[in-house]
Amino acid sequence: MTDDFRWIDAPQGRLYAQRWPRPADGAATPPAPILMLHDSLGCVALWREFPAELARATGRDVIAYDRAGFGRSAPAQAPLPADFIAAEARDSLPALQRGFGFAGFVALGHSVGGAMATACAAAQPEHCQALVTISAQAFVEARTLAGIRAAREAFARPDQFERLARHHGERARWVLDAWIDTWLDPAFAGWTLDATLAQVRCPALVLHGEHDEYGSPRHPARIVEGLAGPARMMLLPGCAHVPHREAKPAVLEALHGFLGAPAR
């Protein structure tokens, strides 16, 4: 299996993207790929081995990309625009479809990437075959803000900030400030995912850690309640904000079942 690295021209600049091909099975028509959208401090590299394992578990190509300003992609404007969640569906998704030559897709996102995946599903209901959210926020909760404030204190330590800089280089400060300043801004306090959820008709799997430090189980419950299509919530016991690392076997098993891949 050979990974496929590409530079994608998008309205916000060049995006770094990578594809992990599905195992060869001789199928004449391959299933729609899974498009992965990372969290507020994430990038392609921070998915680690999960995309390759996901491709094997589901029998689908997996595509992940660095949003503008993150990882290896072009720098982004500061601060984040007010519509930064919807912008991924409007600008990045069509560019990735052109760059990799796909139309139909499965949207999968972690944390704020889950909100962006939901926006992609809402923007292209004719193409999005399924939605998966992992630890996604549906509104601004006191626990979310407390978790971000605690992270701000943690990243004040040089060793913690250096870990972020390993993946984002000289843009690490922008990445951190964009996350903290956006979510702690009083103007963002009324944000919800409700209107977007109501436009999603495809099947959805909503995964959430029982002890997520950035969001209570009220978030996945609200997501499932707000979606227009069939949805299932899976609360992962003992997990915090990163279930695909903390409970990887359970997450892969759930995704294998949800996306209907044949046993391998």
Predicted regions span which residues?
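Catalytic histidine-centered segment of alpha/beta-hydrolase-like enzymes
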Residues: 239-252
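Short beta-strand/loop motif that positions the catalytic acidic residue
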Residues: 200, 206-208
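Acidic catalytic loop of the alpha/beta-hydrolase fold
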Residues: 211-215
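Flexible "cap/lid" loop of the alpha/beta hydrolase fold
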Residues: 118-123, 127-159
